Amino acid sequence: MSAGSLGGRSRLDEQLERMTADFLSMQDTLAGQLRALQAAFAQGDTSVREEVERLDRDIDAANARIEGEALHLLARQSPVAHDLKLTLLILQSTPDLERAGDYAKHVARRLSALRAGTAGHPSEFAQALALLLQMATTLRAASSPMNAALAHEVRALDDQVDALYDRAVEQVLAGRPDAALADTLEASHAWRAAERLGDHLVNVAQRTERLLARPAPSDAPA
């Protein structure tokens, strides 16, 4: 192998390492948002919104770095086989993580109102937050090293979130005659944001499963 080829491989490896590090950092930061939400919901901490928004800015910054790095890599390095699949997985998945961070902000904005009333079924919402945190940490474990079984577990956990969401929304919409409309709307928005957050984590998990299930043509045995 020529010195030029070795240098190109080294640059490609360095770019992939930076992208992967930012990809994993986004997942860690999202888990941090969910831990903050879970603790605030349990303790009645009204300052969590600022913390969640600060962490969301870190997610946005990592997303921007990955986008620039990935586009440069695809244009200049022409990755193939596993390198190309990994690059595309990260490039396609970071918008899902960015949106999940946005939904964490939506939850944070409504957390105190949800906790203060009964319209949103606070005990069930606490369960949903715990499941979402478990989804985020399981996805992180499934991403390095990549693990299809753990990625599948993320989807199974999301089924539990969806079941909680369906029951809660049905009860919220049925409502009690004395429930304030504002409380009902806040509860509905909080539950919807939590459910959508989980869906974005599932999107990433499904891409991980697909990457591991099908080898690229040049990876397949002759």
UniProtKB/Swiss-Prot annotation:
This is Uncharacterized protein DR_A0161. InterPro entries: P_transport_PhoU, PhoU-like_sf, PhoU_dom. It comes from the Bacteria. Not known; probably involved in phosphate transport and/or metabolism. Keywords: Cytoplasm. Belongs to the PhoU family. GO terms for biological process: intracellular phosphate ion homeostasis; negative regulation of phosphate metabolic process. One of its GO terms (cellular component) is cytoplasm. Its main location: cytoplasm. It is found in: Cytoplasm.
